[in-house]
C-alpha cells in the first residue's frame, strides 16, 4: 500500500457555480458518495500543472486556460489507517482554481469518476463532502494568497483538527 500520494484538485468556476463530481461509480473509492472537485493522482514526470490539466481534460473534456489557472495551495491530508505500515496515510493535494476554459463538458455517462454537475456555491455545504473541504473552499472564496493547510482525519473519516500556514 502506497501511504504517501500526490494529487491535484481544481475548482472550476462558471458564473456562481463550481463543477463537481459526485463519486458514485467506483466500487472501492475512499471518496465514495462524496462531492469533490476535479483532479487526481500524479503520473510519473508530471508537475502539478501538468497533472491538473490532464485530469481535468480526462474527467470533463474541458481545457483549462493556463494563464487563468491559479495554484492556490497545498493541502496535506493525514488519515489514520490501520492497514498502513505506520498507521497513517498521507496525501499532498495541490489545489487549483480556474474560471476560464474551452471545450465541451462530457456527458456524465462518459466520466469514469462519477456524475459531473455545476453546483451553486451557496449549495456546496449541503452536499455530502469531506469536512475539511469547507476550510479550503472558504480560503479560496476569500482569495487568501497561496496557503498550506494540514487536515487530520481519524480512520472513520472524521476531521480531528487542522492547521493553516
Per-region residue spans from a language model:
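Residue-level signal for short segments within beta-strands and strand-turn junctions
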Residues: 12-14, 22, 97-100
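Unchanged
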Residues: 42-66, 77-135, 139-140, 161-165
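Low-complexity, intrinsically disordered Gly/Pro/Thr-rich segments
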Residues: 144-153
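Conserved N-terminal beta-strand and adjoining loop/helix that marks the start
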Residues: 1-19, 41-43
